[in-house]
Amino acid sequence: MKVRASVKKICRNCKIIKRSGVVRVICVEPKHKQRQG
């Protein structure tokens, strides 16, 4: 899980979702998981 100021899709499997007010990226590749902080 990376905490970033700006979350971006890294590959085509990445999806940007908003979970309880927090922007997240979920992906099949665990390295691509991100959270806005």
Swiss-Prot record:
Keyword Membrane appears in the UniProt entry: no
Entries under InterPro entries matching the protein: Ribosomal_bL36, Ribosomal_bL36_sp
Pfam families: Ribosomal_L36
Keywords: Ribonucleoprotein, Ribosomal protein
Record GO biological process: translation
One example GO MF annotation: structural constituent of ribosome
GO annotation, cellular component aspect: cytoplasm; ribonucleoprotein complex; ribosome
Family annotation (PROSITE patterns): RIBOSOMAL_L36
Family, as annotated: Belongs to the bacterial ribosomal protein bL36 family.
Protein name: Large ribosomal subunit protein bL36
Organism: Shewanella amazonensis (strain ATCC BAA-1098 / SB2B)
